[in-house]
């Protein structure tokens, strides 16, 4: 077997629920100032689910659609791995439910299970799949990686940053989006910025301000680690590797970020600029950033609003060209936890000039509270046009049903009633589901879930 080349994403599909909440209406409903969510967080709409959809139904819909749209033979898949932080069972994996899409075709030889670590699980599953294809264990088949989640909060202040969705990715050689193994920075640590210790409820415990600082701090450390790795690689190759310099932003043409909210993405890009400036000996790199902000202590720099605003302003033009396409869809969808970064990636490729995209490098930042993070690179190694056309994300988002805050609150109440329950018949309306969507039909007395498919 020849060594596989250009291993990465060969195809992608995304599924979002058919209903969404207008954040402008939600601002009025919650009695906050106009623009707090739409401008302050950069969020226009938010996907949400009733009790008819769960992490498994979202995944079933996305994977079945991926197989259908891209004419993938279920027998051609040798690994199936799920990243999620919304499990409905402490032992039985979401992946086990997805085997129902493959077993009827005679395929029960499917490696991989679920990977759980907050919003980072999808990225870990992606790396596992790529490593499998590049390993001696590879049997020549492709892999599918699934990132599926529902983000729901108890506190009113956090609810605007909810959302729901699933991204499924076909992984293999000769991909159109290939991972760049030389472009990776990793940071892992122990934090309590966001966690879910109460198994009786769907809600997390969140320290919002600490979580933002943890996110930005992780980005800083990934920046450092990526530079350390690229410099080490150059030394190992006796200087034969292309020079990367000391600026991480010079390594990428575009960027996509894990997106709890869109405002955090603009702060993050500015933060990368700040780290590049700290590593630079060229005074011109600090242009637009006042002198008094250049020597802040590290702790102060994470929370200094004047520095934050200066960095966002200094990178505004670059951000618009290199990053803004990645938040077009997240601003209309909200947070999808593990699927968030990959929704951003789909948004990016759906909103750039594909004619000139081949050969470009995309930087991606993945963060999961607790905390796990990686800043890594992908290269466009093929024509993305077919994939973007088949995903058709931006058009599909316009077809959702915009519902009222009262409808959203009712849906939340249904989910609260259903969570952890048995002998339960879901009450949510299925009429708005599109044909081919999987939904929860019932939960029996032994907690076993039955799913149905919306017909024509």
Curated annotation (Swiss-Prot):
Keyword Kinase: no
Organism expressing this protein natively: Fusarium sp
Induction: Expression is increased upon exposure to hygromycin B.
Catalytic residues (positions): 85 (proton donor/acceptor), 119 (acyl-thioester intermediate), 258 (proton donor/acceptor)
Reactions catalysed: acetoacetyl-CoA + acetyl-CoA + H2O = (3S)-3-hydroxy-3-methylglutaryl-CoA + CoA + H(+)
Name assigned to this protein: Hydroxymethylglutaryl coenzyme A synthase
Function of the molecule: HMG-CoA synthase; part of the gene cluster that mediates the biosynthesis of 1233A, a natural compound known as an inhibitor of HMG-CoA synthase in the mevalonate pathway and with antibacterial and antifungal activities. This enzyme condenses acetyl-CoA with acetoacetyl-CoA to form HMG-CoA, which is the substrate for HMG-CoA reductase. As part of the 1233A biosynthesis cluster, is involved in conferring self-resistance to 1233A.
Alphabetized GO MF terms: hydroxymethylglutaryl-CoA synthase activity
Binding site for (3S)-3-hydroxy-3-methylglutaryl-CoA: 34, 119, 161, 211, 258, 267, 335, 369
InterPro entries recorded: HMG_CoA_synt_C_dom, HMG_CoA_synth_N, HMG_CoA_synthase_euk, Thiolase-like
UniProt key word Lipid biosynthesis: yes
Keywords: Lipid biosynthesis, Lipid metabolism, Steroid biosynthesis, Steroid metabolism, Sterol biosynthesis, Sterol metabolism, Transferase
CDD domains per UniProt: init_cond_enzymes
Loss of function: phenotype: Does not affect the ability to produce 1233A and 1233B but leads to increased sensitivity to 1233A.
EC number: 2.3.3.10
Pfam families in alphabetical order: HMG_CoA_synt_C, HMG_CoA_synt_N
Gene: g431
Family the UniProt entry places it in: Belongs to the thiolase-like superfamily. HMG-CoA synthase family.
GO biological process: acetyl-CoA metabolic process; ergosterol biosynthetic process; farnesyl diphosphate biosynthetic process, mevalonate pathway
